[in-house]
Amino acid sequence: MKTKMITREGYNKLKQELDYLWKEHRPEITQKVSWAASLGDRSENADYTYNKRLLRQIDRRVRFLSKFLPEVKIVDYAPQQEGKVFFGAWVEIENEAGEVMKFRIVGPEEIYGDAKGYISIDSPMARALLKKEVDDEVQVPTPSGIKEWFINSIEYDKGE
């Protein structure tokens, strides 16, 4: 089984999400389900149906997070990473057309909701960038062929 990795920032966000879902959101929705059920006929009760579905979604996410968080390996910055691309790096790349992209390489579970500026460690781009340095040229396989990118900068969040 592949080790599941996550940045400390990602772990903290998922932990906050679990706490919110379990301590605040789920009790609120449970109360709405109880209220809607008390109105009588559930077969045509839109409030009951909607909130019951929402409760199932919350429970599914809580089960996933409760199982995932204890199994995950938090990857913190290490001084040996400096100057090379590894898990957790913020990387700025540029192609010959002058297009610039900046993103952070993270675990796939960290990319959810409206998260922008993150790519999965499992993506072809991240795999091509790993262990490369600033000014290295990287060839990335894409459905339309090989694309070339140059690494402009590599940064790490060193705090926490």
UniProtKB/Swiss-Prot annotation:
UniProt KW keywords: DNA-binding, Transcription, Transcription regulation
One matching Pfam family: GreA_GreB_N
Signal peptide: none
GO biological process, one term: DNA-templated transcription elongation
A molecular function (GO) term: DNA binding
Family designation: Belongs to the GreA/GreB family. GreB subfamily.
Task of the protein: Necessary for efficient RNA polymerase transcription elongation past template-encoded arresting sites. The arresting sites in DNA have the property of trapping a certain fraction of elongating RNA polymerases that pass through, resulting in locked ternary complexes. Cleavage of the nascent transcript by cleavage factors such as GreA or GreB allows the resumption of elongation from the new 3'terminus. GreB releases sequences of up to 9 nucleotides in length.
HAMAP family (UniProt xref): GreA_GreB (MF_00105), GreB (MF_00930)
NCBIfam families the record matches: greB, PRK01885.1
Name of this protein: Transcription elongation factor GreB
Organism of provenance: Vibrio vulnificus (strain CMCP6)
Gene behind this protein: greB
